[in-house]
Regions:
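ATP-dependent helicase/translocase motor core
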Residues: 1-150
Length: 150
């Protein structure tokens, strides 16, 4: 904590951290409580979540390929403005896959090129699944999209 107080620049470029004992692997923001660290259990959105030793490989192959890692850093980290503390929120894997799927569906069905039906679709998420953050991440993707001339 002393480094955070005395040399805050040291942590400026830290997007998130990973903790692992080889069986259980989780990621989260540097100073977040352990309860806010989550496993990345899928490489592809359509596969079954992996547990145990497989979850480490799932995190390595699902979160750290260059393109996805840069996407997460660029589009899926959020700093709430109204927080009284320094808070950094990193997406969970279901939020990442949902926002990406919604974005691709909106892009595919948009009338940008005159071919889509203009329907974006519906998103259903269970209570506590992070729907608000998923919508925030989707909005960020849409606003930053060159396809939508944003």
């Amino acid at each position: 904590m002393r480094y955070r107080r005395d040399i805050p620049e040291l942590f400026k470029y830290n997007a998130f951290v990973v903790i692992s004992d080889g069986v259980n692997s989780k990621y989260g923001s540097l100073f977040a409580p352990y309860d806010y660290f989550y496993a990345w259990r899928k490489v592809h959105p359509d596969e079954a979540p992996r547990e145990g030793v497989e979850s480490l490989m799932s995190m390595m192959h699902g979160l750290f390929p260059r393109e996805r890692l840069l996407d997460v850093i660029h589009n899926f980290i959020f700093f709430p403005e109204n927080s009284k503390k320094e808070v950094k929120i990193v997406c969970r894997y279901p939020q990442y896959f949902a926002a990406r799927k919604l974005y691709n569906n909106i892009l595919e069905r948009s009338r940008i090129h005159g071919e889509g039906d203009g329907k974006g679709g519906t998103y259903f998420g269970a209570t506590g699944s992070g729907k608000s953050l998923t919508m925030l991440f989707l909005t960020r993707l849409l606003v930053r999209s060159k396809a939508f001339a944003s």
